[in-house]
UniProtKB/Swiss-Prot annotation:
RNA polymerase that catalyzes the synthesis of short RNA molecules used as primers for DNA polymerase during DNA replication. Its cofactor is Zn(2+); Mg(2+). The lineage of its organism: Bacteria, Bacillati, Cyanobacteriota, Cyanophyceae, Synechococcales. GO terms for cellular component: cytoplasm; DNA-directed RNA polymerase complex; primosome complex. Contains an N-terminal zinc-binding domain, a central core domain that contains the primase activity, and a C-terminal DnaB-binding domain. This is DNA primase. Monomer. Interacts with DnaB. Residues 265-348 form the Toprim domain. GO terms for molecular function: DNA binding; DNA-directed RNA polymerase activity; zinc ion binding.
Length: 694
């Protein structure tokens, strides 16, 4: 039987999931050497380790026989298999769905590939048009802006192919469709023109804007960013998502920066196009920018191909908006950072300036010095938590401690946790040595109690995910379809310390909602809203459903059907939205609480319990004077020896009391909990250890 033609998406998915070390180590004994692995080459009679495997580059190479390639090539050469056979085997191994091409599908794919080439051609011609327009009289103001306001040299303008979109409604449309004879639907597909509502022709998407081409890794133009020159909103307008232009998979400037990233073993990620352009002009050419979105895991992995140490510096603005962008970026790759798979640092420039503004007033050496001193992401986050806090006020002190405990509880490395516990204790004690010692002890105990977060799935029952999915969906439906309750939802989540949603589709939808609201309300108002404060009327006035419907193509990985179009049952439930909301939130919190209980119960059960008899025996061996209060000494020793077990016992019973409180709230709205059985609601763990007592 012939091996079927595989769909390109299947091949791409296999390449993304296949790990070179995982595959090679099954055939070759590998030893760690620096960032790479070495072993005896399987392709020739190797006497000394000349075979190198690079996890960062997903590549192997033998310095003796010259064999080299990616994971697929390794298996093809070793097993003498065809490309398709290896890909099929890997697809089964990594559980990648296999799609194949029939003859007709193969022909359609060839047609699509041909159309892609035409799209590249259209975008290249558009780039030339914008570049030429910059040199014409109508582009004089844009050129003056680049030279005077941005202080760019001619070589930099040409390097980045900067241009100008004329103010006329259809200058580019006329040039491409009528003069260059490109099909109108092709030009529209490239994101350059928009069809008129009356169906009579097209108008230019970009008008009277400074044009910044966005390139892929091969240096081909795939989209544009257009900056207004008149104060018109939005300040920056990007190309829409197209076949070629996917914002989450691209980084502005990477085509020009990748060699420098490999040389410097570091990538600098900034916020704006002109930050990248200014840094490259100053000789700091290992800088890139995300395209108006938080840095994604995929973008981080893209950068990791070029940096052996996977070192990434986030250089975002030092204002609150920049800090929020940095926090979003950290959130996307936090697990990679905790595991040490990426060395993440954060650089905030003084005075709240971006890189472009800073370089206009300071030297390149100043910037490089700040770059070299940029703190690790965890140090930066701790700094953010302590900034502008009055630690003499109990509520602020408690809030800081709780947030820091959550951060440190996720660290898998015990020595590193100890380092940060002592460092934070020193800062919280404000120079008081005795207080620092006590704080370090308290923090260590609290962090130990938080360690279950890193192993969440271990403490989760099989049915928890589906129950949580129902509850989170109900919260989102209330938020979307009951606008008067939006501030109440925000306040409830904030007060319960529920940081967003657990399931990825819900997180993406919540993030999209927040971006829409921030665009309407502004950052300052949105900051209050996220804390459950501010004006609920302004929040309620935003018509989220149609806006989200228009953004369907941008929300990959989210099925919005059940959120935007309500069923009859949904309509019935939402006739009493407030009890529904309270019940759903209580259920989300209950699931978290149950998980904590299971963890604490397990930790408690694993402690060695020392009896009073054991304590008496120890004291007798040590010798007790006649004038000593023996009962007090026995009690003190009992508490000392059982300190850990008593700690977990106390935490466990606190959680059980909280569960009872949540169950009372749950009774307000039974229909929010139809997915929860009586057993789910009561069974926390098989057996509760006996309390430690006399």
């Amino acid at each position: 039987m012939d091996t079927p033609r595989l769909h390109p998406e299947t091949i791409a998915a296999v390449k993304e999931r296949a790990d070179i070390v995982d595959i090679v180590s099954e055939q070759v004994v590998l030893k760690k050497r620096g960032k790479d692995f070495v072993g005896l080459c399987p392709f020739h009679d190797d006497k000394s380790p000349s075979f190198t495997v690079s996890p960062a580059k997903q590549f192997y190479y033998c310095f003796s026989c010259g064999a080299g390639g990616n994971p697929i090539k390794f298996l093809m050469e070793l097993g003498k298999q065809s490309f398709s056979e290896v890909v099929l085997d890997l697809a089964k191994r990594y559980q990648v769905p296999v799609r194949t091409l029939e003859v007709q599908q193969h022909q359609e794919l060839q047609r699509q590939l041909s159309r892609r080439e035409r799209l590249y051609e259209v975008l290249a011609v558009a780039t030339q048009f914008y570049e030429q327009s910059l040199r014409r009289p109508e582009g004089a103001a844009a050129l003056d802006y680049l030279r005077r306001s941005r202080q760019l040299q001619e070589s930099t303008i040409q390097k980045f192919q900067l241009g100008y979109a004329p103010a006329q409604w259809a200058s580019l449309a006329t040039h491409l469709i009528e003069q260059k004879r490109f099909p109108a639907d092709l030009v529209e597909e490239a994101g350059l023109v928009v069809a008129r509502r009356n169906g009579q022709g097209y108008y230019d998407r970009f008008r009277d804007r400074l044009m910044i081409p966005i390139h892929d890794l091969q240096g081909r133009v795939v989209g544009f960013g257009g900056r207004t020159l008149t104060g018109e909103e939005p300040k920056y307008l990007n190309s829409p998502e197209t076949t070629l232009f996917e914002k989450g998979k691209l980084l502005f400037g990477l085509d020009k920066a990748r060699a420098a990233i490999a040389k410097q073993d570091q990538a600098v990620v900034v916020e704006g196009y002109f930050d990248v352009i200014a840094l490259h002009a100053a000789g700091i050419d290992h800088a890139v920018a995300s395209l108006g979105t938080a840095l994604s895991r995929q973008q981080v992995k893209l950068l990791s191909r070029y940096s052996e140490s996977n070192q990434i510096v986030l250089n975002f603005d030092a204002d609150r908006a920049g800090a929020k962008a940095a926090e979003r970026a950290i959130g996307e790759v936090e697990d990679l950072a905790y595991q040490g798979q990426v060395q993440l640092r954060v650089l905030n420039l003084p005075g709240g300036k971006d890189a472009d503004e800073y370089l206009q007033r300071h030297s390149v050496a100043d910037y490089r010095e700040l770059l070299a001193r940029s703190p690790l992401w965890l140090d930066w986050q701790i700094d953010q938590l302590l900034r502008d806090r009055n630690l003499d006020q109990a509520d602020q002190f408690q809030a800081v401690v709780q947030a820091i405990v959550q951060l440190l509880g996720k660290l898998p490395n015990t020595p590193l946790r100890t380092h940060y516990v002592h460092q934070v204790a020193e800062r919280l004690s404000q120079g008081e040595a005795r207080t620092a010692v006590q704080l370090a002890s308290d923090l260590r105990a609290q962090v130990r109690g938080q360690r279950w977060h890193g192993q969440a799935s271990r403490w989760e029952k099989p049915g928890d995910v589906s129950i949580r999915e129902q509850a989170e969906a109900q919260i989102l439906k209330v938020y979307l379809h009951c606008p008067r309750l939006r501030l109440a939802v925000r306040k409830t989540l904030h007060d319960r310390e529920i940081q967003g949603f657990s399931l990825q589709p819900h997180r993406l939808l919540w993030q999209a909602i927040a971006e829409i609201e921030e665009a309407h309300l502004g950052f300052a108002a949105m900051y209050q809203v996220e804390r459950g404060e501010g004006n609920g009327d302004d929040l309620a006035a935003i018509d989220l459903v149609p806006i989200l419907r228009d953004r369907l193509d941008q929300l990959t990985g989210v099925s919005l059907g059940g959120f935007l179009e309500l069923s009859e049952n949904d309509h019935a439930d939402l006739t009493h939205p407030l009890p529904l909301l309270r019940g759903a939130v209580a259920l989300v919190e209950r699931l978290r609480c149950e998980k904590r209980c299971r963890h604490l119960l397990d930790s408690w059960a694993r402690q060695s319990i020392h009896t009073f008899e054991h304590c008496i025996e120890q004291l007798l061996q040590a010798g007790i004077g006649e004038d000593v209060d023996a009962e007090a000494q026995i009690t003190a020793l009992h508490e000392q020896l059982n300190q850990e077990a008593l700690h977990f016992q106390k935490l466990y019973y606190n959680e059980r009391r909280y569960l009872q409180q949540l169950d009372q709230e749950r009774c307000l709205n039974p229909q929010a909990f139809l997915g929860m059985t009586e057993h789910d609601a009561t069974a926390i763990a098989p057996t509760t250890p006996q309390p430690i007592s006399a």
